[in-house]
């Protein structure tokens, strides 16, 4: 289930212009229990579908700590991958997004890295905060 939302006091805010690294505020309170998506900018290009290969910039924050874990913007290199090869939260939360768009994804643990976590700043049962800029649908 995907909850699309436009605003919630518990969700982090995202700021910054298109084409640059977003700034994400620290989350407040308990995370949503379902996948939540919010379009920060709606793109006008080609639409991503479940079978798409994508070129994106992304920023990842851990909900429990509010710590920025990683960002492709820091290296200046986009990430390219088939949507079918990433975590379920992306597989469910990215389709429908269009090139040029920026989307906030709040991904519960069962659609992320689950009870095992991913090591480092992504511990067990971590809710993930992603801001995804869809550069290209390949």
Language-model features, listed with the residues they occupy:
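Cross-family detector of peptidyl-prolyl cis-trans isomerase
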Residues: 1-138
């Amino acid at each position: 289930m995907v909850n699309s939302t436009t605003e919630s006091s518990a969700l982090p805010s995202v700021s910054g212009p298109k084409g640059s690294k977003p700034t994400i505020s620290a989350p407040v309170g308990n995370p949503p229990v379902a996948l939540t998506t919010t379009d920060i900018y709606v793109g006008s290009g080609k639409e991503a579908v479940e079978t798409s290969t994508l070129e994106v910039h992304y920023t990842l924050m851990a909900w429990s700590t509010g710590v920025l874990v990683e960002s492709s913007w820091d290296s200046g290199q986009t990430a390219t991958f088939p949507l079918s090869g990433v975590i379920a939260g992306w597989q469910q939360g990215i389709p429908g997004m269009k090139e040029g768009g920026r989307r906030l994804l709040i991904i519960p643990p069962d659609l992320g890295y689950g009870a095992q976590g991913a090591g480092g700043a992504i511990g067990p049962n971590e809710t993930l905060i992603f801001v995804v800029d869809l550069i290209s649908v390949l």
